[in-house]
Amino acid sequence: MSFEKSIKAMEQAEKLMPGGVNSPVRAFKSVDTPAIFMDHGEGSKIYDIDGNEYIDYVLSWGPLILGHKNQQVISKLHEAVDKGTSFGASTLQENKLAELVIDRVPSIEKVRMVSSGTEATLDTLRLARGYTGRNKIIKFEGCYHGHSDSLLIKAGSGVATLGLPDSPGVPEGIAKNTITVPYNDLDSLKLAFEKYGDDIAGVIVEPVAGNMGVVPPVNGFLQGLRDITNEYGALLIFDEVMTGFRVGYNCAQGYFGVTPDLTCLGKVIGGGLPVGAFGGKKEIMDYIAPVGTIYQAGTLSGNPLAMTSGYETLSQLTPESYEYFNSLGDILEKGLKEVFAKHNVPITVNRAGSMIGYFLNEGPVTNFEEANKSDLKLFSNMYREMAKEGVFLPPSQFEGTFLSTAHTKDDIEKTIQAFDNALSRIV
């Protein structure tokens, strides 16, 4: 398998863009592998500029839940493009997608469309602070909520301490309004509320942590968040940018039966086009301009192409879609465990709907500290060999893999065999 054209393309890209990319993970640095430039996709497959074919488990980092080049989505996008790409005014497409989102997401009575997941979480925190009149936000270690300043925060020296900047350029003054506690740890959360409860506006959480490699909530964790935030008058915010419509037909909140006050969405609701959204109770959402005084705006918010793609994507998902994801996930999980056991390599497999995470450790993995015990060197070696086998995986141990309705049992069986072949060469 040749990567010659991708290597040359990256050399040129590095002269034009920082690191040659427009999002750091695309540089493949964490797996010490040359970046792969893609050309096109079809169904469950993706093709690079060297002509190599891969079974795709990245799916544009989650949005392509129907696979590449879904014909219904493409056809409706052609119709939308023929009418124009953006108008700076409202369109019927916004109403259609909003109605569908409100119908399926238990917590959302009103929704505001934006252009990215980062924008959704940023605006949601502003809304939570404005609504409650409080300043502090609690987030969980290992949960990623986009790259806004107040969320690029790591934990301090102890449990439930005020945050410290996790990136140059984030002022300490902003970081000090973010409290970071371990994921799946209600005791630490209670300590934070006991110390700062009167000034905590909200708790933001990925109901399934998708940016430490897919870590589901332990039993009672999400309900505990709901109970504690209710007790202290803080808002519970679910960041479902990744989990939205991937964990279940009614998102993670429907699957786990816990309803937050506010929800952030993205990825799947754009069907591969740039989009984000946030929504919640009418009482809270009506604090946003032009009805309320909390300002939020966006030139391309509710873009008709993104709204069309999102609507046509969600309209094809049914409860049966998630039964299909579970059936494929069962086969993949069983196959992975058998192959890794054959080669005497430890593996932990975590699943949530169409999201699957595997860790090269003994497990269990319920938080960021446990995820960090994975064998990162082995992961990098395996990643390179899997690419040679024609399987495109996320180039990071701390990113989940995704299934689509376009994936088949044959894809899964080929993937299991590819892992067997790869491990045979490196173990």
From Swiss-Prot:
Tell me which species this is from. Staphylococcus epidermidis (strain ATCC 35984 / DSM 28319 / BCRC 17069 / CCUG 31568 / BM 3577 / RP62A)
Subcellular location as annotated:
Cytoplasm
Q: What class of enzyme is it?
A: isomerase
Endpoints of the signal sequence: none
Matching NCBIfam families? hemL (TIGR00713), PRK00062.1 (NF000818)
| Reaction catalysed by this enzyme | (S)-4-amino-5-oxopentanoate = 5-aminolevulinate
- The protein depicted here goes by the name Glutamate-1-semialdehyde 2,1-aminomutase 1
Q: Which residues carry this modification: N6-(pyridoxal phosphate)lysine?
A: 267
PANTHER family reported in the protein's UniProt record: GLUTAMATE-1-SEMIALDEHYDE 2,1-AMINOMUTASE, GLUTAMATE-1-SEMIALDEHYDE 2,1-AMINOMUTASE 1, CHLOROPLASTIC-RELATED
